[in-house]
């Protein structure tokens, strides 16, 4: 091929090569875009921060204000609130009319039914298969294999109830928590 003076020796990109690069770039971009959420799913979130805490909410979705809650509930009362991950969680009023430092996840450890508090028998009784738990959520009759999960209940400075994951030893069994 003859060279014209003043022209550099840079080869032209042919039409076919350009279309191949364009197609490859489009397919690669689409594949990476589709794989991003899959990869993100398998990478655990960074630890630290609030530890997955949630402000307790009442049946209407309003934040629970402890002073208002205690005005409406008697000592020994156990009532449901929305807790961590939206799970139904029992708020417990102690005998000295304070919020207990723990709450109970109301999901039965047998098949996942919500376990109601039975005031007359002073225990939780699962309506699905009859599992029973004492007032602290410890299993006393199966078929449930484990006690109800605990959450830490804390009252904030602005009078709200916050649930955070329970990471200490389970005071009912003296063992590491099974739910962590």
Curated annotation (Swiss-Prot):
Enzyme class: translocase
GO biological process, one term: photosynthesis
SS bond list: 113-128
UniProt keyword list: 2Fe-2S, Disulfide bond, Electron transport, Iron, Iron-sulfur, Membrane, Metal-binding, Thylakoid, Translocase, Transmembrane, Transmembrane helix, Transport
Domain Rieske: start-end pairs: 66-162
TM region(s), chain numbering: 21-43
Binding site for [2Fe-2S] cluster: 108, 110, 126, 129
KW Transport (keyword) present: yes
GO MF assignments: 2 iron, 2 sulfur cluster binding; electron transporter, transferring electrons within cytochrome b6/f complex of photosystem II activity; metal ion binding; monooxygenase activity; oxidoreductase activity, acting on paired donors, with incorporation or reduction of molecular oxygen; plastoquinol--plastocyanin reductase activity
Cofactor note: Binds 1 [2Fe-2S] cluster per subunit.
Reaction(s) catalysed by this chain's protein: 2 oxidized [plastocyanin] + a plastoquinol + 2 H(+)(in) = 2 reduced [plastocyanin] + a plastoquinone + 4 H(+)(out)
Organism superkingdom: Bacteria
Principal localisation: membrane
Pfam family, one: Rieske
EC number of this enzyme: 7.1.1.6
Signal sequence extent: none
Keyword Methyltransferase: no
Cofactor(s) the protein needs: [2Fe-2S] cluster
Membrane topology label: Single-pass membrane protein
Localization terms from the record: Cellular thylakoid membrane
Gene Ontology annotations for the cellular component aspect, listed alphabetically: plasma membrane-derived thylakoid membrane
Extra information: The Rieske iron-sulfur protein is a high potential 2Fe-2S protein.
Function: Component of the cytochrome b6-f complex, which mediates electron transfer between photosystem II (PSII) and photosystem I (PSI), cyclic electron flow around PSI, and state transitions.
Subunit note: The 4 large subunits of the cytochrome b6-f complex are cytochrome b6, subunit IV (17 kDa polypeptide, PetD), cytochrome f and the Rieske protein, while the 4 small subunits are PetG, PetL, PetM and PetN. The complex functions as a dimer.
Family: Belongs to the Rieske iron-sulfur protein family.
Identification of the protein by name: Cytochrome b6-f complex iron-sulfur subunit
Organism: Thermosynechococcus vestitus (strain NIES-2133 / IAM M-273 / BP-1)
Name of the gene encoding the protein in the UniProt record: petC
């Amino acid at each position: 091929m003859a060279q014209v003076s003043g022209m550099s020796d840079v080869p032209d990109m042919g039409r076919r090569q350009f279309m191949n690069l364009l197609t490859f770039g489009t397919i690669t971009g689409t594949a990476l875009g589709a794989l991003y959420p899959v990869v993100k799913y398998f990478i655990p979130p960074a630890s630290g921060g609030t530890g997955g805490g949630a402000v307790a909410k009442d049946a209407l979705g309003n934040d629970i204000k402890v002073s208002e809650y205690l005005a409406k509930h008697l000592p020994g009362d156990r009532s449901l609130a929305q807790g961590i991950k939206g799970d139904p969680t029992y708020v417990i009023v102690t005998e000295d009319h304070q919020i207990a430092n723990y709450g109970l996840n109301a999901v039965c450890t047998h098949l996942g039914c919500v376990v109601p508090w039975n005031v007359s028998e002073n225990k939780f009784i699962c309506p699905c298969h009859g599992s029973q738990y004492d007032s602290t959520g410890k299993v006393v009759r199966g078929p449930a294999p484990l006690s109800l999960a605990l959450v830490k209940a804390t009252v904030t400075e602005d009078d709200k109830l916050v649930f955070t994951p329970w990471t200490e030893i389970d005071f009912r069994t003296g063992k590491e928590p099974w739910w962590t």
